[in-house]
A protein has these predicted regions:
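N-terminal glycine-rich anion-binding loops that anchor highly charged ligand groups
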Residues: 22-56, 78
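Hydrophobic, small-residue-rich alpha-helical packing segments that form membrane-like cores
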Residues: 2-7, 19-25, 108
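Homeobox/homeodomain signature
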Residues: 14, 20, 29-32, 84, ...
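A short glycine/serine-rich beta->alpha loop
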Residues: 17-24, 39-41, 65-70, 146-149
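Sparse, context-dependent recognition of short Cys/His-centered cofactor- or disulfide-binding micro-motifs
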Residues: 15, 24-27, 103, 131-133
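Thiamine diphosphate
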Residues: 48-142, 147-149, 153
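A near-ubiquitous, low-amplitude feature marking generic local secondary-structure context
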Residues: 13, 17, 25, 40, ...
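Generic N-terminal amphipathic, Lys/Arg-enriched alpha-helix
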Residues: 5-19, 34-40
Length: 153
């Protein structure tokens, strides 16, 4: 291939595709960060604005990350907590109202702790673009004693 020919994504190796700079959405960046941090189990319940996190993680090699849709957000959190109890780094993704569904295991887990890393990626929906309500997850996390990393410019 000469220098003038374009490289289609299909022509690149997986390593080349991951190391070349290209813009990412916020959800893709969360997935990439999880993969780079060694997350091996990812579970989620689909709901905008968080759906693309698991969809992006599912594009990585299945031997590297087990990405699965769950029946609901509580089940997604249970899967991630179970993996973290076994020393595996895990992630559960959901939208803000899904955190309400997962409240029981989340509130209990924060006092039990984990053996592997555990990340809950919860996407709020300010302005109610695709949800039935607007809530501030930071307040929920404060109640549950969960540290919060908040994206900014």
């Amino acid at each position: 291939m000469n220098k003038m020919e374009a490289v289609r994504p299909d022509d690149r190796s997986e390593d080349q595709a991951r190391t070349q700079a290209h813009p990412l959405t916020g959800n893709e960046a969360i997935a990439r960060g999880a993969w780079e941090a060694g997350v091996k189990v990812a579970s989620a319940y689909p709901g905008t604005p968080s759906t693309e996190i698991l969809e992006s993680l599912a594009t990585y090699d299945a031997d590297e990350v087990n990405a699965e849709w769950s029946t609901n957000e509580k089940v997604a959190v249970d899967v991630a907590i179970g993996a973290s109890f076994q020393g595996v780094r895990a992630l559960a993704a959901m939208k803000h109202v899904g955190l309400n569904v997962a409240a029981d295991p989340v509130m209990s887990q924060t006092y039990v702790g984990v053996n592997g890393g555990l990340v809950l990626a919860v996407c709020d929906d300010p302005g109610i673009h695709s949800s039935q309500n607007e809530q501030d997850t930071r307040l929920f996390c404060r109640l549950a004693n969960i540290p919060v990393l908040e994206p900014s410019d």
